[in-house]
């Protein structure tokens, strides 16, 4: 711009804000600094923040136009240079006070980034240096020289992408060596005196004599030296190479510049060399690169491209060239403006990224480490997006990426770059994100195996306080995550403390280090730090152990309670953990929590030691009598483990053995196995004498024969007696007066033993009935003995269940989200998982009579009674107490908690019997077996035939429904043949106070309904529209939905009306129309409120009945397509439309309900398969004009009729091929042209097959009603319109393969033909005066048209 500017003193100094008065697109934000040459400000634009550089014009003769053209050309040349950011706009103010340059704002330049935390590591510096050379190479190959490369003009984004900006071709190429004024004016904008200019640009001052003469004598005319300069020499590539070398050197010396102005001038003359600064560059290849780039002779400097090739694999890793540069360049494009998109792209490419950056097939380890370090560049992209992510899925994807990359990152990156963002996410508004952030933080910190000096206090001062609030988070899922990870967090914090302590001791013991830096020394000594850490963790552990949600407590116990014991030490493990855990057994409603206690108590007891056995003994005994059999199993397993570890004293062991021995006949298989496991472990721990003297007496009642190797599980299991029958056990356990039952059973046992002469029947009728029921279920004397052996357990369990019931009544048992199946009387269905042995038919036949008592009522109902209905009297009768089943019930081997419910179908047998080895009573005579067996089969066959008949009826119903669907009519009352409305106004209805949005007619044409922006829905009687009454009013008005009612529809075959409002409400109304013409009633039946942020309001709705479902389909503005099953009040299906193709404006459903089509605001028409809920195809209008209304074609199943924005266009599209088959064009514009001189559009469509001759009625913004005869287009006409409308004719032509019916205005008024009916008198303005919003027809004694308009008017025509 000439060197003369340096000497001009401004006549007036204005603030930079004052120059924004004439700029309308930019709003001043803040000043970025000012110099004599430029005033720099940041401004707001609709596309983002921009930098505005203002040049105050002091000399109006300056040739600014040429500079503006040069900058425009430079912008075009650098369009494809991804590392260059030229000025996007150059403007001169109208008042000619200033010239302004505009470019995108980038927050950080390289000078600021070098001194900003987190500091750049070596690989990031190499990456930035690589990009600087790449940017210079891109500019030079585009024919552009920069002229002012310095750290202030190298912009660095938050993801370390370099942008070379502020191209200074307008600044002077050459500067006088003896006068620093020009340098200060043009290049030293930072006032640091740092010089990046190539030495050859400083020339002898004689060539600037003209300027000096002017400064001495102001009367001398000023000469613009710029043109002369350009003829003498322009900017050379070598000049930019020198400047780039200075920038790279400053990057690798932590901000120490190579030259200031005086040093550069001395270097130019050979009196100075920056060796001292260059030696600070540790990397030899980088030092050699810089040395070559700052050669004093320009000819010795290479091109930027040559340096890139030369340093490939040396200063710059190979992966920069092969992967990082092309991959990262895609994020610099405008298509990736969203942080969410960047994260999703990286997650999609993660496998490829890991393969390229962390491949394990490298020949040398050093190269592998170099490639792995390239992940740091990728991490900067991820972290730059974290704070601006919008969707929950994107945030979770980012956390997933961090977790995948963390094991391959260095400690510094994990602590300095990753951890702060994870703590930021721990304060996110979405609970899922907070929970996942905590999990990710825990796993990332667990990877740190060494602690840097500056991070010695990161846990107590940063991490633990940063997540402390999560222990009291409102969301249970977050507290769950805290409970799940607090043990690992505490373990990692302790390891950090120990690593810091070890490092401190090593530093103190080194002879060369007399003093330890106070900044890196941990606060206080080790014991003090450990005590503080214990207190911080203890506070959160106690909070979690006292959480109101049991699942949080359970999670804490199941995830590292033993590690917390190690962290706290023995004393605190006993005082803090064990004392809180004991209280969990008081919760009688949550057996999962009690079970988790016994799962985790072994680890705690093992750490606390055998001293805890006296405390745990009553707790373990309580677990052995728990009401839930799962808890008993867990208590048995805990006792077994504690016995193996020697944590139980010998007297306690024998006491537990006495309590556990009766479990050997418990009906639950898992409990029996648990009891066997404990007995065998005890046998291992004690001597042989103790086994036979103390242990065997407990076992004798439950084994069939003496056993020697009692410590072997298989041996003990093989000699166990048969367990108590599950049905008998459960029935006895559920009895209210179980104590009286056991007293009577004890008396019966004494009588059998001979110690009691007689056992009178029980006096209590309830006990007598109970005993009779037990005997009828097969209770034998042996079963009675086993029940008595389990007496203590059953009494305690009965009391525990009673207490649990009482406690559930005291507390609110109907907890939110908890369904009590027992309270609902629902019985779980079970099958035995033990495979039964196949037996010969005659054996199975013999057992049928005896097994009937064990089969439940449902089995009998399904397959018939096992006992024939008419048993011959010759069969011997046996008493109840003699009848013992030969097979075992499935519940004899499993409890309700253990068995897996395989099916809820009644066909699944609940009595998969396992035959007994020894029958207890003789079988019946073989003479009656064949008939008994035959009768059972006949009963089963009858049930099977009934099932087959039921299935046949169901199949017939489905076939009829299918036929109904195939024979579905387009409309129940079509217009009469040859119907051509005359356009006579029958009724003018003005009850609505705002725009009417939709009209719908009921199936039998008895009613029609309108909805309006005034919030009302009005029901009209069609019979009163024939003009026979003097006044016509609506028969019903409904206004309780709120908001503006946008759409409505009648349900097929009913007087149910569905309506939707813009406040998100959708309601189903019932209309009692059986009393017409009397006033009917209306009442809401169902309703739902849509999420305005997630779904938005409803834009269109339809109803169809598929036989099995009555579906109300509605589309929302945010792209949701929902099928609401009105019979089950749930969604039959939900589809999600991609909003990239536009917002949904309308949709239509195929008459056979096989597919639907949606229209969008961008002209797209997308088809969905209703059977599989999958998108089929999508076609777009050539002009991408908005689809205003969609309708199915009445004759062609694959066609849709679409009303398009502009030119009154209505087109018929074959969605199977995507072809536009027929277009109705009521516009003066050339048919099918994309220009729209006519803004009018069709807003309402009515189509009818009309007995094979389809007709179409349209109405819209031109306030005309048109009748289109699709068979004979020339017979189409305007039914009703504004007064004085010119007459029109219709012609059919073929344009580009599409049939077009065009409306053409007649030049002269032609009388109506015989076929065209006359409209009403021309003088009566009967037409609408505002946009017609919808049109419909109904049939009474004749055909009628009903229209509605934006001014709230409803008109009826015939």
Swiss-Prot record:
Pfam families: Pkinase, VPS15-like_hel, WD40. Disulfide bonds: none annotated. Residues 26-324 form the Protein kinase domain. WD repeats lie at residues 991-1030, 1040-1079, 1093-1134, 1139-1178, 1182-1223, 1237-1278, 1327-1358. HEAT repeats lie at residues 413-450, 458-495, 572-610, 612-648. Residues 875-899, 1307-1326 are annotated as: Disordered. Coiled coil: none annotated. Regulatory subunit of the PI3K complex that mediates formation of phosphatidylinositol 3-phosphate; different complex forms are believed to play a role in multiple membrane trafficking pathways: PI3KC3-C1 is involved in initiation of autophagosomes and PI3KC3-C2 in maturation of autophagosomes and endocytosis. Involved in regulation of degradative endocytic trafficking and cytokinesis, probably in the context of PI3KC3-C2. PANTHER family: PHOSPHOINOSITIDE 3-KINASE REGULATORY SUBUNIT 4. This is Phosphoinositide 3-kinase regulatory subunit 4. The gene is Pik3r4.
